[in-house]
Amino acid sequence: MNQGKIVQIIGAIVDVEFPRNNVPKVYNALKIDGTAIILEVQQQLGDGIVRTIALGSTDGLKRNLIATDTGHAITVPVGTGTLGRIMDVLGNPIDEAGPITYTDQWEIHRNAPSYEDQASTTELLETGIKVIDLMCPFAKGGKVGLFGGAGVGKTVNMMELINNIAKAHSGLSVFAGVGERTREGNDFYHEMKDSNVLDKVAMVYGQMNEPPGNRLRVALTGLTMAEYFRDEKDSSGKGKDVLLFIDNIYRYTLAGTEVSALLGRMPSAVGYQPTLAEEMGVLQERITSTANGSITSIQAVYVPADDLTDPSPATTFGHLDSTVTLSRSIAALGIYPAVDPLDSSSRQMDPLIIGEEHYNTTQRVQQTLQKYKDLKDIIAILGMDELSEDDKLAVSRARKIERFFSQPFHVAEVFTGAPGKYVPLKETIRGFKAIVDGEYDHLPEQAFYMVGNIEEVIEKANKMTA
């Protein structure tokens, strides 16, 4: 048994001295005698001293306490025993529902699947949200990012996606709450409970009030649980299709920045850690699909000061298959979900994957919206009357498209009082195709606001004229 003693404590950073011939490896977990605190080795400083990060509060720690090397990285329980439970970064239950039953424990630091084991798919994942299904469709087994500044609706959009996909998708889900509000974690738990899908969801939380070590590692804990479901073969010899929700990936980066500063590394651009790209890559490369099973990942990405060129969101962009960008200017118009249809993109946007009709409709919608965007300056200076008849028609259609992108959400029913709407992809394509074809030029634009499919628009317009 390899034991050392604490020699220095600076906030969440603890230095431990071991015999020089028996220094623990980087990422090994150390247990401190008489406490529940786990330390993770981050650096070997020489002379037998290792610098570690504490996964938990260091209150009450003092010099010369004995730390024991476990000989392996942090391990967490995996398997069906985690479903329906809320756990912390170490896999301990925090929902007061008794101990977790498990048959296996996995280390949270793992290698990504090898190149030949990976598999890609072109199968689409229908979300029931019009603007997403039309403009930036999701792939099954793909990676999706929800980008947005503070208060534009990332978490509400994620909750709606969970509501629409996790309920329709019979597989398993893992939710990792990384550095977010505890209230949101609580809301999510009750939302899942009320909709009877709690027994298919494992929840791992490392919230805002926790030390940086917890927030940095909790995403890996959630990912490890998802990997187990993907890789563990059932009686048919296949793994499972898993949904992995991470809210919020920016807090993962931020925790890394805090840890990096505490470890004494020289900061890089905007104060981020110099290892930002590597840390992001280590996490993202593991979120992938294999021939055995798939992980479909939906990640919320906070955009500091609405600046998409900030190193953190910019580093995340390269790893994603679909990006859903939420815009403050669209939220200011009262259009929710506040997705920017011109700034959101998807690798699935190919006629061979989504079909000619969907592709052509999306292109025409984008052209109409882009034309309106280009004309906005002229309208602001000269007014609508100075536009040509063709331009007036384009503006009218674009405003209808903008409003038709809005949609009442199931998870927002309690706030808005309007019942949520799920719109199948075929209905979405049919509706937008009809608008750009000019079939509804005679209807008022207010009729397109906060409805489901195009039939509801006609119904609303008839009520308005009645």
Curated annotation (Swiss-Prot):
Cross-referenced SMART domains: AAA
Annotated membrane topology: Peripheral membrane protein
EC number(s) given by UniProt: 7.1.2.2
Enzyme class: translocase
Gene3D superfamilies to which the protein is assigned, alphabetical: 2.40.10.170, Bovine Mitochondrial F1-atpase, Atp Synthase Beta Chain, Chain D, domain 3, P-loop containing nucleotide triphosphate hydrolases
Subcellular compartments: Cell inner membrane
Reactions this protein catalyses: ATP + H2O + 4 H(+)(in) = ADP + phosphate + 5 H(+)(out)
GO cellular component, as recorded: plasma membrane; proton-transporting ATP synthase complex
Binding-site list for ATP: 148-155
Molecular-function GO term, any one: proton-transporting ATP synthase activity, rotational mechanism
Annotated keywords: ATP synthesis, ATP-binding, Cell inner membrane, Cell membrane, CF(1), Hydrogen ion transport, Ion transport, Membrane, Nucleotide-binding, Translocase, Transport
InterPro entries: AAA+_ATPase, ATP-synt_VA_C, ATP_synth_F1_bsu, ATPase_a/bsu_AS, ATPase_alpha/beta_chains, ATPase_F1/V1/A1_a/bsu_N, ATPase_F1/V1/A1_a/bsu_N_sf, ATPase_F1/V1/A1_a/bsu_nucl-bd
Functional summary from the UniProt entry: Produces ATP from ADP in the presence of a proton gradient across the membrane. The catalytic sites are hosted primarily by the beta subunits.
Subunit structure: F-type ATPases have 2 components, CF(1) - the catalytic core - and CF(0) - the membrane proton channel. CF(1) has five subunits: alpha(3), beta(3), gamma(1), delta(1), epsilon(1). CF(0) has three main subunits: a(1), b(2) and c(9-12). The alpha and beta chains form an alternating ring which encloses part of the gamma chain. CF(1) is attached to CF(0) by a central stalk formed by the gamma and epsilon chains, while a peripheral stalk is formed by the delta and b chains.
NCBIfam families xrefs: atpD (TIGR01039)
Family note: Belongs to the ATPase alpha/beta chains family.
Designated name of the protein: ATP synthase subunit beta
Organism expressing this protein natively: Xylella fastidiosa (strain 9a5c)
